[in-house]
Curated annotation (Swiss-Prot):
Organism phylogeny: Eukaryota, Fungi, Dikarya, Ascomycota, Pezizomycotina
One Pfam family of this chain: MLLE
Record-given protein name: Polyadenylate-binding protein, cytoplasmic and nuclear
InterPro entries from the UniProt entry: Nucleotide-bd_a/b_plait_sf, PABP-dom, PABP_1234, PABP_HYD_C, PABP_RRM1, RBD_domain_sf, RRM2_I_PABPs, RRM_dom
Recorded GO MF terms: RNA binding
Organism listed in the record: Neosartorya fischeri (strain ATCC 1020 / DSM 3700 / CBS 544.65 / FGSC A1164 / JCM 1740 / NRRL 181 / WB 181)
Biased composition (Gly residues): 603-629
Superkingdom as given in the UniProt entry: Eukaryota
Length: 751
């Protein structure tokens, strides 16, 4: 996931030179690692004489620019504040930059506001250093470990402030805010760091002896760790018989060389836990012990002898093994495992195998089913109830028989297969067989339903593809909406908070806008606008019944791009596919006129040709050349594409057009067929069916029986919805006059 560039230090916070350390900070939060490398200067005057920029880290994700402005404006005049956010999700990264007009205010804020609680978390303030070379130098950076849990950032700062000027100070914390027992102090000079190491290393802090040393970069630690692995002396042994004593355990390995320590791990009761450690004085002795004793059988148990590993090492190895096994499994079934959907309830594993057996060797075939819940009544439970009734009637039974019948009933209940979920998987022995099955079986009618057959995908792959398709679809909609409105593409600029009296500016690269001075407390989101007012009239409404120039718009429209207010074809974005279907198809056939005030654009023609109310031609006749609430001429929108004819729709035809037009073409083809069956609810049912996959909709166009079944199913769902809605509402209104019946039906279709 991409993130905005941080100007804070970015070294890692792992324990200094110790293998047991784990990486406490992921790269998703650059401010977490800011302590380890920073500017070697105490003030920005050395490299940036006119800079008064502060880095503010350890922020709660909910902290906003306004909250920071309220805090930092108490020191002096704030030039600007920016909370850094992820470029995609726009979530806060946990750090921000505060710019003052003069350096003195920045120094005072650094002194007075450092470690101030913001939403329950102490913030960490330091000078912003924009030079990456200076940020990455570890000069003056000190690492402290074995800290007491009660020592926080401020306590650590107060302890080490006596040895020199501190640029930044931090105690590493977990996700719950608890101390990890180590921290970092970054001094202005290397002399101050050496002085702190000399005086504090080995001292007691809160009755705990601390280690203080120079910070070692991750690269250097990694090379040192690899060297330690190659020259190990500590050996781990497991599968040890519990009867083996400490003396016997030591004698097993004395023949390989001098032993500095040998111990068996025991529980609280003193019993052996079956493993132990032996530390040799030399690496050669340890290597010889591993080579000879590994897999050797002692007292009936085969020993495991290997290099002793730290916990994080073992976790990393297990993670790599799991990842390798997952990739191997995925590659094994890549291209041979098929996903089959739209199965009828009577299709089981055997029938599924029979359907696909002509295409090759099947290694497995399975139909996914629901699990039987405890509340469902099975045949075994019915038998138990009848047995209880017989007992009440006076039949004598022993106590063992009911228990046996209950146990048998439980076993039988576990074996009962649940209802089919309508999909399954078929695995072939080769990719060629699988591809042949996809070609032949996809969209084939089985028991009156068209099958959907495709290569099976993992859940994470499907999710990523779905997210990518949704993002692409939204981008296309925004571009079409902007083109239809005749507006330039929106410029995505991060929000910047300007203080009172600060001059705004147009970002570099943006053209066509007019600079303006933002109002105090204004968040700049879209250049060229101001709160509560749009710079000009809405597009497409010069004159007529549209809004006049500089017309005020409601405050809740502030900061919303005008291109986002309309979808393709001028349809508001608040309307989904069902509503679009009613607008597009509900005004053609059946003698209804077009929507008042909305010109009939390209791709908006209904499937029928007739006259609307009042004799106005709907399709097949000339367009109206003006009228109330309608422009005199409706030129085709810029960037709009003509929707191809819907006759003889195929998958290739659909793939040649954007996704929104695919649904439009399918809707235009489905509407006349559905109207022939349900004239009153054709628009609603069309919208409901458009939620299905395009491949299934193509199958419905070819199969009248399957379409009729889907229409009946949609009608039953709609009736159930109206029934439930009617039960929860107030009593129905009185019957409306006959002359309003047509208008009522129209409003229902629009809802």
């Amino acid at each position: 996931m991409s993130a905005e560039v941080s100007t804070t230090p970015a070294a890692d916070n792992t324990v200094n030179g110790t293998p047991e350390a784990t990486n406490p900070a992921a790269t998703s939060a650059p401010e977490v690692t800011a302590v380890e490398s920073a500017s070697p200067s105490a003030t920005p005057s050395a490299n940036q004489p006119h800079s008064a920029s502060l880095y503010v880290g350890e922020l709660d994700p909910s902290v906003t620019e306004a909250m920071l402005y309220e805090l930092f404006s108490s020191i002096g005049q704030v030039a600007s504040i920016r909370v850094c956010r992820d470029a995609v999700t726009r979530r806060s990264l946990g750090y921000a930059y505060v710019n003052y007009n003069n350096t003195a205010d920045g120094e005072r804020a650094l002194e007075d506001l450092n470690y101030t609680l913001i939403k329950g978390k102490p913030c960490r303030i330091m000078w912003s250093q924009r030079d990456p070379a200076l940020r990455k130098t570890g000069q003056g950076n000190v690492f402290i470990k074995n800290l007491d849990a009660a020592i926080d950032n401020k306590a650590l700062h107060d302890t080490f402030a006596a040895f020199g000027n501190i640029l930044s100070c931090k105690v590493a914390q977990d996700e719950f805010g608890n101390s990890k027992g180590y921290g970092f102090v970054h001094y202005e000079t290397a002399e101050a760091a050496n002085n702190a190491i000399k005086h504090v290393n080995g001292m007691l802090l809160n009755d705990k002896k601390v280690f203080v040393g120079h910070h070692i970069s991750k690269k250097d630690r990694q090379s040192k760790f690899e060297e330690m692995k190659a020259n190990f002396t500590n050996v781990y042994i497991k599968n040890i018989d519990q009867e083996v004593t400490d003396e016997e355990f030591r004698k097993m390995f004395e023949k390989f060389g001098e032993i500095t320590s040998a111990t068996l791990s025991r529980d609280q009761e003193g019993k052996s836990r079956g493993f132990g450690f032996v530390n040799f004085s030399t690496h050669d002795s340890a290597q010889a012990a591993v080579d000879e004793m590994n897999d050797k059988e002692i007292k009936g148990q085969k020993l495991y002898v290997g290099r002793a590993q730290k916990k994080h090492e073992r976790e990393e190895e297990l993670r790599k093994q799991y990842e390798a096994a997952r990739l191997e499994k995925a590659s094994k079934y890549q291209g041979v495992n098929l996903y089959v959907k739209n199965l009828t309830d009577d299709v089981d594993d055997e029938k599924l195998r029979e359907l696909f057996s002509p295409f090759g060797t099947i290694t497995s075939a399975k139909v996914m089913r629901d699990t039987v819940t405890a509340g469902e009544t099975s045949e075994s439970e019915k038998e138990k109830e009848s047995n209880k009734e017989n007992e009440k009637e006076g039949e004598e039974k022993t106590e063992e028989k009911p228990k046996e019948s209950e146990e048998e009933a439980k076993k039988t209940e576990k074996k009962i297969l649940g209802k089919s979920k309508g999909f399954g998987f078929v695995c072939f022995s080769s990719p060629d067989e699988a591809s042949k099955a996809v070609t032949e079986m996809n969209q084939r009618m089985v028991n009156g339903k068209p099958l959907y057959v495709a290569l099976a995908q993992r859940k994470d792959v499907r999710r990523s593809q779905l997210e990518a398709s949704i993002q692409a679809r939204n981008t296309i909609r925004q571009q079409q909406a902007a083109a239809a409105a005749g507006m330039p593409q929106p410029y995505m600029q991060p929000a910047v908070f300007y203080g009172p009296g600060q001059q705004g500016f147009i970002p570099a690269g943006q053209r066509g806008g007019m600079p303006f001075a933002p109002q105090p407390g204004m968040v700049m989101g879209i250049p060229g606008g101001r709160p509560g007012q749009y710079p000009g009239p809405f597009p497409g409404q010069q004159g007529g019944r549209g809004m006049g120039p500089n017309q005020q718009i409601p405050p809740n429209f502030q900061g919303i791009p005008m291109g986002a207010m309309q979808g393709p074809g001028g349809i508001p974005n608040g309307m989904g596919y069902p509503q679009m279907a009613q607008v597009q198809f509900g005004r053609g056939a059946g003698g209804r006129g077009q929507v008042p005030g909305m010109p009939m654009g390209q791709g908006m023609r209904g499937p029928g040709y007739g006259q609307g109310r009042g004799g106005a031609p709907v399709q097949g006749g000339p367009r109206p050349q003006g009228g109330r609430g309608q422009p005199a001429a409706a030129p085709p929108a810029a960037g709009r594409e003509e929707v191809p004819a819907t006759g003889g729709l195929t998958a290739q035809t659909l793939n040649a057009v954007p996704p929104p037009q695919q649904k439009q073409m399918l809707g235009e083809a489905l509407y006349p067929k559905i109207q022939a069956q349900q004239p009153e609810l054709a628009g609603k049912i069309t919208g409901m069916l458009l939620e299905m996959d395009n491949t299934e909709l193509l199958g419905l166009l070819e199969d009248e029986e399957a379409l009729r079944a889907k229409v009946d199913e949609a009608l039953s769902v709609y009736d159930e919805y109206m029934k439930n809605k009617g039960e929860g509402e107030a009593p129905a209104e009185p019957a409306k006059p006959k002359e309003d019946a047509a208008e009522t039906a129209t409003e229902e279709n629009k809802s």
